Amino acid sequence: MRRPIASTWIALRVLLAAGAALAANAVTAGAPAPAFTITDTSGNSVQLGDYKGRYVVLEWTNPECPFVRKHYSSGNMQALQKEFAGRDVAWLAINSTNASHSEFRTPRQMSDWMKSQAAAPAATLVDSASEMARAYSARTTPHMFVIDPAGKVIYNGAIDDKRSANLADVKSANNYVRAALGEAMSGKPVTVGVTTPYGCSVKY
């Protein structure tokens, strides 16, 4: 019995250490957004600099995650994407599931899933080596970041304050992303710039 317990304890320590490392390297509100160059599901190269002078939303996603499905099955994520696309916000969805993981989806599979959900991001990015996730210390799906036109992070955290996978919670939720964008685009300081994200772990 000792060996399995020891192995489990070691694995737990590794997971805790990894989580601590991500937290220590987290991109805080007010910090410059890490630059990235990554390929989207159509094979096009996408850089943060492509959206210079615009607000950018980064949405970490994974179709296998029930927390992600909560926001897509309810239409909540698509509504946000479309609402802010109409206000010239660049919304980028990122799947950072490592190519070696069982939940990995190919670019074609991700594209097909997004279409099946009637999603409307400006692009869906395939981070199959999890490099972009590490740069941003993305921890969960969903994990949301809002970047201002000057290239600084003004929000990092959960999509809302209802930390569940229950579709019924969406209607009564306080949506942090909508609030941050609304305040910033009105010339006001962002009241809540950092929250703790919730959801499934990013599959590094």
Would you name each region that the model predicts?
Residues 9-22:
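Bacterial N-terminal signal peptides
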Residues 146-204:
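Thiol-/selenol-based redox modules, centered on thioredoxin-like
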Residues 36-56:
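A short beta-strand-turn-helix
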Residues 20-35:
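N-proximal helix/coil linker or "cap" segments that precede and/or mark the start of modular domains
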Residues 50-69, 181:
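Short active-site neighborhood of thiol/selenol oxidoreductases, capturing the structured segment around
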Residues 69-117, 128-135:
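Structural microenvironment flanking redox-active thiols in thiol-disulfide oxidoreductases
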Residues 53-56, 86-91, 119-122, 149-150:
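Loop/turn elements at helix/coil->beta-strand transitions in domains of secreted/extracellular proteins
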Residues 111-148, 153-154:
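Short, internal strand/loop/helix patches
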